[in-house]
Amino acid sequence: MSYKKFVYFINLFFLLGATLLTFFLILAGGRTTGVLKNFYWFQASTSGFNSAPSVTRWYNYNWCGWESRGIAVNCSSKMAAQPFSPRDNFGSSPLMPSTFLNNRNAYYYLSRVGWAMLLIGLFFLLITLVSVIASLIRYNRRTAALATAMSWITLFFITLSACLYTGCYAKAVKAFHHENRDARLGPKNFGLIWTTVFLLIVNAICCTIMVATHKRNEYIYDRSFASTKTVDSQTPTPVPTNGGIPSSVPVTEVQQSQSHQNHRFFKKLRTKKRTVTSAGDEPDRVQEERVYTEQNVPVVS
């Protein structure tokens, strides 16, 4: 397998992996049973926050109380871009860390904007996937440039989403720990989103390498083609050597020169032939028969 094909397939493999992880990350939290119940963003001890459960998990679309036996209970109603804001989720409480009361907007908008960036990143990710597949089918400058541009745009939005989510929930962990409450990040969700970022980095680099290699090959080809045309224009047309005429002379001139020599530089040679009429004739009766033949013999100057 050539170097280019290897880079193409590595690029496509990593891009498909990033697309799969992003879809799974968005679907995570859609159900609070089965495997998806373990895909959450944040878990903390919320006992004493008015009517909040003792332990709460925040998912993509809702939050749920979490029991020690591994069952989600008392879940909130589902909604897209469920914000992380204990004050909005449970109401104000004196036992709640003060940062959630004083800096409510920071947590609220970090979580919601992070979700929006994730959806925008998924949109550009699908465009990137289509453009990369198109460049594999028929590679040209436009498809390669589109795939590269979409790869970097997708990387920007997915990375921005990962940073917003990480910043939001890392601040929340610090706030809960400051109040001696247990809190932790969801390892599976953050593992998925940062793995997606890594795959997209590799994809963007591969697309850039392919475009750079393609442009370099076109530049080398253009220069070699231009130099070949220059040499061909300066070199006379080779003509086979015929009759001592230089090979650089056109064929028509050679034919005209030979025709000219045939008319002016040939002489006629006569040869004499003796024949004996009969074997018994005497020498004095030998008859000489003059037979003249004409031959065109070229004269060597």
Curated annotation (Swiss-Prot):
UniProt-recorded name of the protein: Uncharacterized plasma membrane protein YNL194C
Give the UniProt subcellular location, in the record's own words: Cell membrane
The family database entries (Pfam families) matched by this protein are listed as:
SUR7
Query: What coarse category fits the chief subcellular location reported for this protein?
Result: membrane
A biological-process GO annotation: fungal-type cell wall organization
Tell me where the transmembrane regions lie.
Answer: 6-26, 113-133, 144-164, 192-212
Provide ranges: composition bias, Basic and acidic residues: 282-292
Q: Report the family membership.
A: Belongs to the SUR7 family.
User: Topology versus the membrane, per the UniProt entry?
Assistant: Multi-pass membrane protein
* Residue ranges that the UniProt entry lists as topological domain Extracellular: 1-5, 134-143, 213-301
Region annotation Disordered: residue ranges?
Answer: 254-301
Q: Where is the composition biased (Basic residues)?
A: 261-275
Question: Is Isomerase given among the entry's keywords?
Answer: no
Protein keywords: Cell membrane, Membrane, Transmembrane, Transmembrane helix
Give yes or no: UniProt keyword Lyase: no
Stretches assigned to the Cytoplasmic side:
27-112, 165-191
